[in-house]
Amino acid sequence: DALRVEMNAVQDGIDRAVEEKVRSQNMKTELITNVSHDLKTPLTAIITYVDLLKDDSLDEATRRAYIETLDKKSQRLKRLIEDLFEMSKAASGNITFTPQTLELGSLMRQVLCELEDRTTASGVDFRAVYPPEKVYCMLDGQKTWRILENLIVNITKYAMPGTRAYLLLTQQSGRAVLTMKNVSAEELDFDAEHITDRFVRGDRNRSTDGSGLGLAIAKSFTELQGG
């Protein structure tokens, strides 16, 4: 009986290893496909609008509209490349952190203030709750700002308009705990545990502007700072 239990445990371990290997291979294939798609889409638009701007018969209003669209597509491509670069550095551990004493509540307020236009436009009612005491942590300010920004922007993209999103900051056993809750506008057709995987997006039709790397970067930056 003991031998049978041990053999079953070994078999279970092998099955899990095979399953993980297959999943890893599938993720690599999907990653390459998604990178190709997300780079190609804005790049194709840029090439198209550059060609359109070569038309000397364009009136000034149309020319300005094309230039504005060209700028938006260029910025999207720039953000995607920056996200890919950050994700690559985080995955390889080749990233520098500069810890300093931060008051997390103040940083949250600053990020929310900076993103006020975006949160208002989303139609989501953001409710931030802070503890009465200050919450000090040793963190890299720039990376932590990026974590908060990515999480909040993700809510503006995928939360159901007209609902509330809660940002709750607490201290538990000497550690800062930040909890964010919102009602999703999309039906998730994948396991919630995979939501922070690279290129996983809440909208499978990829209709929202984004790289699918925001939560993956937030997770990596959090874990690399001991969170």
Where are the model-predicted features located?
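Short beta-strand/loop element within the Bergerat-fold HATPase_c
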Residues: G162-G174
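Short helix-loop "hinge" at the ATP-lid/N-box region of the Bergerat-fold HATPase_c
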Residues: I155-T156
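A conserved beta-strand-to-alpha-helix junction within the catalytic ATP-binding
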Residues: T98-L112
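Detector for a conserved hydrophobic position within an alpha-helical segment of the HATPase_c
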Residues: T222-E223
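Conserved catalytic submotifs in the C-terminal HATPase_c
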Residues: T98-L102, T120, D125-V135
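Short alpha-helical segment of the dimerization/phosphotransfer core of two-component systems
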Residues: K72-L77
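Conserved micro-motifs of the catalytic ATP-binding
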Residues: S92-F97, Y136-L139
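Short conserved segment of the HATPase_c
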Residues: E187-R201
